[in-house]
Amino acid sequence: MRDQHNGKIVNISSIAARRSAPAMGIYGIAKAAIEMLTKVLAQELAPFNIQVNAVAPCMVRTAFSEPFWSNKDLHEAIVKTIPLGRIAEPIDIAHPTLFLCSSGADFITGQILLVDGGASAI
């Protein structure tokens, strides 16, 4: 990317970088570190026309999060924290990520895009 003076890096963070939850401490710390790395790399790589951003989703229906969304009580509790009233599907994260990889995002760098169904608004 440096040699080509062009590139896009999109890291995957999480709402857990901003919102604490029991038993999620290490995960949240790791995601917060990814967000800081995103901002630092954005500054370091900008002279090479490389944009570095991150997408920070809320709960996404994946195998990793299955213990949370497959439990009816936990699922209901999680959905109550998301104004759009559902957990995210992988495609909900894919589209914003693809945008950040496109030429439409050429002037966006060092940003953390919250894709959380409005959860960070409350």
Model regions and ranges:
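A short helix-coil junction within the Rossmann-fold of NAD(P)-dependent oxidoreductases
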Residues: 1-8
